[in-house]
Amino acid sequence: MRYNELWRILHDSGYAEGEAKAVTRMLLTDKYGMTTADMLCEEIEKYSDAHTLSEDVSALKAFTPVQYVVGKAWFCDRLFTVRPGCLIPRPETEELCRWVEEDYYPSAPAILDIGTGSGCIAATLALDIPGAKVDAWDISDEAIAIANDNIHSLMADVNVTRCDALNPPADVGKYDVIVSNPPYICDSERRGMEANVLEYEPPTALFVPDDDALLFYRAIAHYASLSLTPGGTLYFEINPLCHSEMCSMLDASGYVDVLIRNDQFGKKRFIKATKR
């Protein structure tokens, strides 16, 4: 089987043509190590045994996210291990990291990443900001194992701890930066989402009740009001539908200089606020 045959199989299974080609390229390059020239000229079986290829094709035909099939996802120009126990890193979240880096490079801040998942935010900030002291929390043991795999393979200096964002410890004045991409998709938004996200990615990392969309943000903002140093900064990835409520909540919580930033698609995706 060759590249053109494989992407056509996926296209016939229901993928759009562009998506079928992109998924095929990611599988062949990131899992099988094929170059563009290899894809044009070589049989895939030269780089993978027939059984593995058959299993991978079957998984993709069932719309398993290609990142889970490959076991890797790109984030800020690095390959991170991903498995179904963590969310697949999104390009939008890269912009959140870049905002922190813009503000704090090269000042060696103390950083906490709440809800670290794969560890992509924590590892990126630890590697990109010299001298940064980075802690990371998650409540999922499976996510913590994945994050630690990434931290070790990338040689990032990050301390990962099991901690519930809704019941945090009583830290005071410990961090210069707290960053989080918590669950923020309302249950009612499920019907507009891709089926493979709903079927394969962990729902506890995605969804919040319709009647309490700011559940995690309020808890984290309260914790940050105690644990940030004076002038420290809180950064969130947010649901664009809730940006006004987020600004109001942070203002009411005593934060200053509350700023919204759009993502690459023009949606109000990020917010930062400064502890007075």
Predicted ranges, named:
Residues 1-70:
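N-terminal auxiliary segments of SAM/dcSAM-dependent transferases
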Residues 34, 64-65, 70, 75, ...:
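Residue-level signal for pocket-adjacent positions within structured domains
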Residues 49, 89-92, 216:
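An acidic site on a long C-lobe helix of protein kinase domains
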Residues 55-129, 134-147, 272:
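SAM-dependent Rossmann-like transferase core, predominantly class I methyltransferases
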Residues 132-133, 137-275:
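S-adenosylmethionine
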